[in-house]
Amino acid sequence: MLPLLPANAEQPNIKCPGNNTPEMRWCASKKLQESNSALEKKLPRAVLMEWQRATKVVCAAAKKPYLQGTIYPQLVVGCDDHLNRALLKEFKGLGD
């Protein structure tokens, strides 16, 4: 699932986690962009693409019960971000 923002969008004045659905979606997309950027620095492009493909499939399956709800896109984006951040923790050293 792609981030929920246009590529050239100005950053709105939103305090995350947001007060309504559009703000919460914006915050979830922002967090996903941040974790994707961090992974781009850690993984070769081909591996990152495979990871993103896999997390999209896994998150879509995990959130399938909410498929017909308006919250579904936000849940999938949040799931993708959580998995990204779990992987990023694996790159930390023992002393971190």
Feature-to-residue mapping (PLM):
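Conserved active-site segments centered on acidic
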Residues: 1
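N-terminal signal peptide c-region/cleavage motif recognized by signal peptidases
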Residues: 4-6
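N-terminal alpha-helical modules
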Residues: 8-96
